Swiss-Prot record:
This is Antitoxin MazE. Keywords: Toxin-antitoxin system. GO terms for biological process: regulation of DNA-templated transcription. The lineage of its organism: Bacteria, Bacillati, Bacillota, Bacilli, Bacillales. Belongs to the MazE/EndoAI family.
Amino acid sequence: MASFNQSRIHNIEQLLKEGYSQMADLNLSLAAEAFPFECEACDCNEVYISSKNNNE
């Protein structure tokens, strides 16, 4: 019975590790999708501001 419980605990730990790993991967992919748009907007704004300053 003790070995069954140890095996069960080990399996639960493995499932938790895999679940946390998948959650981390998902968070990274969502962040990668979200932030480039903000960065592109910032880059466009910087280009606009710098070109406006150069024209003055």
